[in-house]
From Swiss-Prot:
Belongs to the SufE family. This is Uncharacterized SufE-like protein HI_1293. Pfam families: SufE (PF02657). SUPFAM superfamilies: SufE/NifU (SSF82649).
């Protein structure tokens, strides 16, 4: 998916890929949503959860009411799931989505939601 996004010729192609990716993100049950942390400041409601694993890596889950955000979450989780705190400390969510040609086309509120997730990733290393 990453290479497809990088090679997309225009925003419309990227947008279709993002929406398609979001279909892979399962909708959590109400109980699962209740266990996730709400992300404030985004255009649509969004939830995020960090789950530490026994091997010192992390697994992430989340959901949004907006299809585009679900696609972005799915793309993000495929990039960061299974990483250690040290690996996550060097990951820059802003650079990641910028290199994919996505950040430039998102609203400030959507970027704010992603940046809050990025801050939570950095907080894992404190």
């Amino acid at each position: 998916m990453i290479e497809q996004l990088k090679q997309a010729k225009n925003w419309e192609d990227r947008y279709r890929l993002i929406i398609q990716a979001g279909k892979n993100l399962p909708r959590p049950s109400d109980n699962e949503l209740a266990q996730m942390q709400p992300i404030t400041g985004c255009e649509a409601q969004m939830w995020f959860q960090i789950m530490p694993k026994n091997d010192r890596t992390f697994q992430f889950s989340g959901f949004s009411e907006a299809r585009i955000m679900n696609g972005l979450l799915w793309i993000l989780f495929n990039q960061i799931n299974g990483k250690t705190a040290d690996e996550l400390n060097t990951f820059d969510i802003t650079v990641f989505f910028s290199e994919l040609g996505i950040s430039q086309r998102l609203s400030e509120m959507r970027l704010n939601g992603l940046n809050q997730i990025g801050q939570q990733l950095k907080n894992l290393c404190i």
